């Protein structure tokens, strides 16, 4: 039966890898006419701790190659008839839990120290990761006046904005599958210029990690054609809070000034 599972799974993965990587053990077993327990034993025979580890390995290899149409097909097969609110929010909670359980605390502390001690901080993210980069830039700018957001996806313009980067600086690159070439190239450029590199990405196998001195991993996945960035955003929240805790006096002074400015310019509605 294991042999049958091996042959059947190989055919299933080869012929429809984008769906097979997201099948449950039960669905994969049904697809190759074996039991769910046989699929689990099959994963163990391949050297994995169980089927979930095999599944994550498959996903990490193929998710950067999935087109938007294939992503929509995968989501339909995973969520099925579930209410989108229940299905999507449950998956997002699992992503945060997985990130929390696997985050490298030493790497996290190194990232905090590097940002605090840096002469200048450059942040870059493209496509949907650009939202993460903007979010991080917004809050770090409230703590430091040394933070620059690299805002273009054109490689030549990125290099122009980074022309003065060098030793003593830190470059923070954010990218998740499908990885943006502009961010990979920017990481390499900053690395070659002698800057410290912090990669915020989905795994140590990410193309950003090869240039990084510190890699922070957050579990990322797709929901239909939408990139689920819930776990990366949560990790950024933690990183920003940790950095602000190291600069408590500076942050308090900044917000006292901001509160005065906001009051004087009637920024927020108060009679709510």
Question: What is each model feature region?
Answer:
Residues 1-9:
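Single conserved hydrophobic/aromatic residue that forms the stacking wall/gate
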Residues 17-22, 26, 30-33, 38-106:
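HTH-adjacent hinge/linker in prokaryotic transcriptional regulators
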Residues 106-118:
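Glycine-rich phosphate/diphosphate-binding loops that line cofactor/substrate pockets in enzymes
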Residues 116-234, 238-247:
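Glycine-rich phosphate-binding loops that contact phosphosugars or nucleotide phosphates
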Residues 1-2, 18, 110-112, 159-163, ...:
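Short, flexible, glycine/charge-rich loop motifs used to bind or transfer phosphoryl groups or to couple energy/partner
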Residues 249-272:
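A short, charged, Gly/Pro-tolerant segment at domain boundaries
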Residues 12:
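Beta-strand-loop-alpha-helix segment that lines the small-molecule cofactor/substrate pocket
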């Amino acid at each position: 039966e294991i042999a049958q599972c091996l042959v059947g799974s190989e055919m299933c993965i080869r012929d429809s890898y984008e769906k097979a990587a997201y099948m449950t053990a039960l669905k994969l077993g049904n697809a190759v006419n074996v039991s769910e327990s046989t699929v689990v034993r099959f994963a163990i025979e391949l050297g994995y701790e169980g089927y979930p580890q095999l599944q994550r390995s498959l996903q990490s290899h193929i998710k950067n190659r999935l087109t938007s149409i294939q992503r929509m097909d995968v989501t339909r097969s995973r969520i099925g008839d579930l209410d989108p609110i229940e299905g999507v929010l449950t998956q997002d909670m699992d992503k945060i839990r997985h990130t929390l359980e696997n985050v490298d605390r030493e790497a996290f502390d190194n990232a905090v120290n590097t940002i605090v001690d840096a002469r200048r901080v450059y942040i870059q993210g493209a496509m949907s990761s650009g939202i993460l980069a903007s979010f991080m830039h917004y809050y770090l700018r409230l703590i430091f006046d040394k933070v620059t957001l690299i805002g273009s996806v054109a490689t030549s313009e990125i290099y122009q904005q980074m022309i003065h980067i060098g030793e003593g600086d830190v470059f923070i690159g954010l990218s998740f599958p499908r990885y943006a070439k502009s961010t990979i190239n920017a990481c390499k450029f900053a690395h070659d210029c002698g800057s410290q590199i912090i990669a915020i990405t989905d795994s140590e196998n990410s193309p950003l990690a090869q240039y990084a001195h510190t890699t922070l991993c957050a579990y990322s996945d797709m929901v239909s054609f939408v990139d689920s960035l819930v776990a990366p955003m949560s990790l950024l929240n933690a990183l920003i809070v940790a950095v602000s805790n190291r600069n408590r006096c500076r942050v308090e002074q900044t917000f006292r000034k901001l509160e005065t400015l906001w009051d004087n310019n009637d920024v927020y509605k108060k009679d709510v």
